[in-house]
Regions:
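N-terminal binding-site loop/beta-alpha segment at the start of enzyme catalytic domains
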Residues: 1-96, 134
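Glycine/proline-rich, positively charged
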Residues: 58, 107-139
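Generic beta-strand or strand-like secondary-structure segments
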Residues: 80-84, 97, 101, 119-126
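Structural motif corresponding to the early beta-alpha repeats
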Residues: 88-117
Length: 139
């Protein structure tokens, strides 16, 4: 079955979502963010995840929060989001504020553990690949 083309709601910024300035950065973030912890891994279907993300975006929720270990299996939330990003949200990338985190043991050996520079650099590279992104807004 071919997915219908997603077109964001034209009134997504006029539906009542409030935005607040984040610290001294000047960036405006919605009062509600969408955290993709346990609900966007291999337990949920891609279509169910896509429906939830599209609905949130259509309501003005533009801040998506992930981490390298989110999902029932590590990295699966980022992978699922990456598929959705590639298939339907890519035209809206500049309207999205995407964050991800590292800090969990993700692979064997001395370099896959907590917060060494090597671990963090490898973690962001892997996260970007899983999400089909060139950058994130906060890491």
């Amino acid at each position: 079955m071919i997915d219908p083309v997603y077109s964001a709601a034209p009134d997504r910024y006029h539906g009542g979502m409030k935005y607040r300035r984040a610290g001294k950065s000047g960036i405006l973030l919605p009062e509600i963010s969408l955290g993709l912890w346990h609900n966007f891994g291999d337990v949920d279907t891609l279509s169910g995840s896509k429906e939830k993300i599209h609905h949130a975006f259509d309501k003005g929720i533009t801040y998506i929060d992930l981490a390298n270990n989110y999902g029932p299996s590590y990295g699966s939330a980022e992978e699922t989001f990456g598929q959705i990003m590639k298939k339907s949200l890519a035209p809206y990338r500049d309207e999205l504020f995407i964050s991800t985190k590292a800090g969990h043991d993700m692979w064997e050996g001395p370099y896959g553990i907590w917060n060494s520079r090597k671990h963090l650099m490898a973690s962001i590279d892997q996260s970007l690949k899983r999400m089909n992104l060139e950058y994130v807004d906060i890491f």
